[in-house]
Regions:
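Short C-terminal boundary/hinge segments that cap the last helix of small helical domains
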Residues: 66-81
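Residues in the helix-turn-helix
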Residues: 32, 43, 57, 71
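A short, Lys/Arg-rich alpha-helix, primarily the initiator
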Residues: 1-29
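Residue-level detection of the helix-turn-helix DNA-binding "recognition helix"
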Residues: 24, 38, 49, 77
């Protein structure tokens, strides 16, 4: 009999509140970021919902904004994801 394994439930996730703060501090609109980084509006919308995006998207944003990954995202407990920084 084949046994199926259940994945362990995640306790943390990434959020992008640091990105939104960085954009505000620099006076950059999301549409401008989209053009600067050549990232789709759908990817930016996913980030707004704390959903997964590809590492390519993250690298493009870091290059466009001349910043590090830590400047735009952080790992937080799932229960606190919406309110972190």
């Amino acid at each position: 009999m084949k046994q199926t394994s259940k994945k362990k439930e995640l306790k943390t996730q990434f959020n992008y509140n640091r990105l939104w703060k960085l954009l505000i501090d620099r006076g950059i609109q999301k549409q401008e970021l989209q053009k600067m980084s050549e990232v789709s509006a759908a990817s930016i919308a996913k980030m707004g919902r704390c959903e997964n995006v590809t590492t390519d998207v993250l690298l493009r944003m870091c290059e466009a904004l001349d910043c590090t990954i830590e400047d735009i995202m952080q790992r937080v407990p799932i229960k606190d994801a919406a309110k972190a920084e």
